[in-house]
Amino acid sequence: MSKKLVAYFSASGNTAALAKSLADKAGADIYEIRPSVPYTNADLNWQNKQSRSSVEMSDHSSRPELADTSADIAAYDTIYIGFPVWWYIAPTIINTFLESYDFSGKKIILFATSGGSGFGKTVENLRTSAPNAEIIEGKVNPSAKDIEVLAEMD
């Protein structure tokens, strides 16, 4: 049995709730991916082209700074990574997270929340940030049954 970690970024709390449920079902440790400067409601206003999230997502080289890099990635075989889908891809803080650690030989299983889109180009975009990891597209807005299925993936 592999050692599992659920790492997640949650701007509104929706992804956090799923992450906690998945960690419980998978018997995994949990780690919150936090920006050094927390997002405000104004930052998350996708309808404002000048909002922080809009600016970050329009610049694919944007790498928001992490609050910490204390996750012991080397100790895990399987890492679930959860996030809200923004502009059909993962928020760029997920790229920051992936580029901050060595994921070589790790299995990464993605899960996400979304107001209406699927993964889009998420997997393709994240592979460039963790090229030596196996990245698996999990589920968007997973149901309780989907969480059970994800928990068994390793």
Features from the language model and the residues they span:
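N-terminal beta1-alpha1-beta2 submodule of the flavodoxin-like/Rossmannoid cofactor-binding fold
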Residues: M1-T78, Y88-A90, N95, E99, ...
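Alpha-helix N-cap/loop-to-helix initiation residues
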Residues: S12, W87, G115-F119
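A structural micro-motif
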Residues: A26-A28, K106, A133-E134
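Short, conserved loop/helix-junction motifs that constitute active-site signature segments
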Residues: I73, E99-G105, T128-A130
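Glycine-rich, N-terminal phosphate-binding loop of Rossmann-like dinucleotide-binding domains
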Residues: F83-P84
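Short, glycine-/small-residue-rich phosphate/pyrophosphate-handling segment
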Residues: I109-D146
